[in-house]
Swiss-Prot record:
InterPro entries per UniProt: SmpB (IPR023620), SsrA-bd_prot (IPR000037), SsrA-bd_prot_CS (IPR020081)
UniProt KW keywords: Cytoplasm, RNA-binding
UniProt GO molecular function: RNA binding
Spans traversing the lipid bilayer: none
Protein name, entry field: SsrA-binding protein
Subcellular location: Cytoplasm
SUPFAM superfamilies: Small protein B (SmpB)
Pfam families tied to this protein: SmpB
Role of this protein: Required for rescue of stalled ribosomes mediated by trans-translation. Binds to transfer-messenger RNA (tmRNA), required for stable association of tmRNA with ribosomes. tmRNA and SmpB together mimic tRNA shape, replacing the anticodon stem-loop with SmpB. tmRNA is encoded by the ssrA gene; the 2 termini fold to resemble tRNA(Ala) and it encodes a 'tag peptide', a short internal open reading frame. During trans-translation Ala-aminoacylated tmRNA acts like a tRNA, entering the A-site of stalled ribosomes, displacing the stalled mRNA.
Length: 145
């Protein structure tokens, strides 16, 4: 796989992941330099449709040196038209959300975003998930002895 830049750990706790996709992301030069310096955070970010295009909202990319820009500006995600259509249809019909899971460098040194179609978990679902994880850990410990 490619080199991981950042991961949105909050998504794995708060959502049920239904489908994953790889998307390109439109960046300016200073944003790429900030990403190389690991000054990026996906916590609290999400994706929305604007005029049949998908945008990444509320992702933080720090300012590089003395550049004047917006750290939390919306960034366009690049997907094929059929992928966009399918995603939009699922979001509207099944009331799902789209969130970024991670940013990484691909083999051609391009920044890619891994996005996911997700459904929010309720509080009791999160508790059940934690209980299952704890019991699995205990079972693994018992098996290893």
């Amino acid at each position: 796989m490619a080199k991981l830049i950042t991961k949105n750990k909050q998504v794995f706790r708060d959502y049920e992941i239904i489908d994953k996709l790889e998307a390109g992301i439109v960046l300016q030069g200073w944003e790429v330099k900030s990403i190389r310096a690991s000054d990026v955070n996906l916590k609290g970010s999400y994706c929305v449709f604007k005029a049949n295009e998908l945008y990444l909202i509320n992702s933080y990319i720090g300012l590089y040196m003395a550049v004047k820009g917006d750290e939390r500006q919306s960034r366009k995600l690049l997907l094929h038209k059929n992928q966009l259509r399918r995603l939009k249809q699922k979001v509207e019909s099944q009331s799902l959300s789209i969130v970024p899971l991670s940013l990484y460098w691909n083999k051609k040194s391009k920044v890619k975003a891994e996005i996911a179609l997700v459904r929010g978990l309720k509080k009791h679902d999160k508790r059940e998930k934690l209980k299952k994880e704890e019991t699995n850990k205990k079972l693994k410990k018992l098996i290893s002895y």
